[in-house]
Amino acid sequence: MFTLKKSLLLLFFLATINLSFCEQERNAEEERRDEPDERNAEVEKRFFPIVGKLLFGLLGK
């Protein structure tokens, strides 16, 4: 029973690492394909909600 748990844990660990590497590769490929304008739009989409929440929190108190 112990060896089965050990094997499953090892398999899960290796699968998690493999998935992580796949995501990093995919993100790198997407960055290479993106045009600079598209990347700026993504940054703006992430930036404005954060600033809005921060200002709302400061002004709301």
Curated annotation (Swiss-Prot):
Known tissue expression: Expressed by the skin glands.
**Which residues does the record list as Leucine amide (modified residue)?**
L59
Task: Write out the annotated subcellular location.
Answer: Secreted
Q: Which GO terms describe its biological process?
A: defense response to bacterium; defense response to fungus; innate immune response; killing of cells of another organism
Q: Which Pfam families match?
A: FSAP_sig_propep (PF03032)
Which residues are the signal sequence here?
A: 1-22
Which InterPro entries does this chain map to?
A: Frog_antimicrobial_propeptide (IPR004275)
Which is one Gene Ontology cellular component term of this protein? extracellular region
Propeptide stretch(es), residue numbers: 23-46
- Which intervals of the chain form a coiled coil? none
- Keywords attached to this entry: Amidation, Amphibian defense peptide, Antibiotic, Antimicrobial, Cleavage on pair of basic residues, Fungicide, Immunity, Innate immunity, Secreted, Signal
Q: What does this protein do?
A: Antimicrobial peptide with activity against Gram-positive and Gram-negative bacteria and against fungi. Has been tested against S.aureus (MIC=7.5 ug/mL), B.pumilus (MIC=15.0 ug/mL), B.cereus (MIC=75.0 ug/mL), E.coli (MIC=15.0 ug/mL), B.dysenteriae (MIC=30.0 ug/mL), A.cacoaceticus (MIC=60.0 ug/mL), P.aeruginosa (MIC=7.5 ug/mL) and C.albicans (MIC=5.0 ug/mL). Also shows a weak hemolytic activity.
Task: Return the similarity comment.
Answer: Belongs to the frog skin active peptide (FSAP) family. Temporin subfamily.
What is the protein named? Temporin-ALj
Q: Which organism is it from?
A: Amolops loloensis (Lolokou Sucker Frog)
**What is the phylogenetic placement of the source species in the record?**
Eukaryota, Metazoa, Chordata, Craniata, Vertebrata
